[in-house]
């Protein structure tokens, strides 16, 4: 037998709702480790850095220099 027979479950990170798509209040937009995307208008950060929407609307991504923001309008 071999000592290498282990594998971890995937963490399922990434963008869940893309730009110009609708989102409901409380809907998860980005799952991330650390603040790769920062919260913009009507967005909040969960304790595991998840970005979620505070209101119903359309998701918009914005890059300001090196900083990436996610907004809901």
UniProtKB/Swiss-Prot annotation:
Location within or outside the cell: Plastid, Chloroplast
One GO cellular component term noted in the UniProt record for this chain: ribonucleoprotein complex
A GO term, aspect molecular function: structural constituent of ribosome
Chief site of localization: plastid
Record key words, sorted: Chloroplast, Plastid, Ribonucleoprotein, Ribosomal protein
Protein family according to the UniProt entry: Belongs to the bacterial ribosomal protein bL27 family.
Protein name as catalogued: Large ribosomal subunit protein bL27c
Gene name of the encoded protein: rpl27
């Amino acid at each position: 037998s071999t000592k290498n027979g282990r594998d971890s479950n995937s963490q399922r990170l990434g963008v869940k709702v893309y730009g110009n798509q609708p989102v409901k209040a409380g809907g998860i937009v980005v799952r991330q480790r650390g603040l790769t995307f920062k919260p913009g208008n009507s967005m909040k950060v969960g304790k595991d850095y998840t970005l979620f929407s505070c209101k119903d609307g359309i998701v918009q991504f914005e890059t300001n220099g090196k900083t990436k923001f996610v907004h809901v309008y």
